[in-house]
């Protein structure tokens, strides 16, 4: 058996952080770890995967893989699974990852565990921990079969530094133009100077204490000066102050930046589950009993409407 495969999330050679997270996590299983990358001109990325634990890198290059395409990607992966027989194939729980994994599971007639926050894989079995009931409970889901299939939520695994050999393997191209039943006409990227939430080294999040759009504007000002991503608690998202794609928490996105600033966030357990692994946590809250202070490295008991303008003023100097 060929160990655990991690499907690489990349576009135009830009590798998403979740790929390195999954490679590092798979290294803990004690079996061979391989990165699987489809695309054009992607062989040059192989050394990057080796840095984070890939013992092998399966590289498949062809025009048919230039952009993500469900039919072609599934056809190629099925052929490779039949040839190399991995114990498990894991994907990021992203738009493409969810689509790919579910179509692959259907094609192979196998079970699939999705949106896992923890995973353990052994021969012929995978145990996936998932949040249920809006993050109020955790469920362990066992998936049997070979290979084990699952998707992992970005941000829940630590990026390690255990390197692998990174030996490049080039399987035959199995997908053909006949497998392509959707065509990508163009990509229209979101126009934002801020980093993506799960990729950022610094995150500044606002909660109920922001009291409305004016408070969120302060959070955004601070974030922009720090070169940070903007996030929010469920309260600020449900109030419509920030978009749902910016929710941090067990039912939103999990982040682990070098610095996490929580402004006006009390620290409900669901929110803490999404950011408590951050390297350094700074909190601003008027409530001395706010749970956020229990996980903070630095806390300020004060009104964010006074603290943030002062920080902004100092950072501009």
Swiss-Prot record:
What PROSITE patterns does the record point to?
ETF_ALPHA
Report any one BP term from Gene Ontology. fatty acid beta-oxidation using acyl-CoA dehydrogenase
Spell out the protein name for this chain: Electron transfer flavoprotein subunit alpha
Q: Which domain of life does the UniProt lineage start with? A: Bacteria
Q: What is a single cellular component term in the Gene Ontology annotation?
A: cytoplasm
The record's listing under InterPro entries reads:
DHS-like_NAD/FAD-binding_dom, ETF_a/b_N, ETF_a/FixB, ETF_alpha_N, ETF_asu_C, ETF_asu_C_CS, Rossmann-like_a/b/a_fold
- What's its job? Part of an electron transfer flavoprotein involved in syntrophic growth of S.wolfei with butyrate. Probably receives electrons from butyryl-CoA dehydrogenases, and transfers them to the membrane-bound quinone oxidoreductase Swol_0698.
- So, what pathway does this thing act in? Lipid metabolism; butanoate metabolism
**Which cofactors is this protein said to need?**
FAD
Compartments, as annotated in UniProt:
Cytoplasm
Q: Which cysteines are joined by disulfide bonds?
A: none
Q: Which protein family is named in the record?
A: Belongs to the ETF alpha-subunit/FixB family.
On induction, the UniProt comment says: Highly expressed during syntrophic growth with butyrate (at protein level). Seems to be constitutively expressed.
User: Which molecular-function annotations from GO does this UniProt entry contain?
Assistant: electron transfer activity; flavin adenine dinucleotide binding
Task: Give the record's keywords alphabetically.
Answer: Cytoplasm, Electron transport, FAD, Fatty acid metabolism, Flavoprotein, Lipid metabolism, Transport
Q: How is the cofactor bound?
A: Binds 1 FAD per subunit.
Q: Where is the organism placed in the taxonomic lineage, from the top?
A: Bacteria, Bacillati, Bacillota, Clostridia, Eubacteriales
ATP-binding: present as a keyword of the record?
Answer: no
Q: How does it assemble?
A: Heterodimer of an alpha and a beta subunit.
Lipid metabolism among keywords:
yes
Pfam family, any one: ETF_alpha
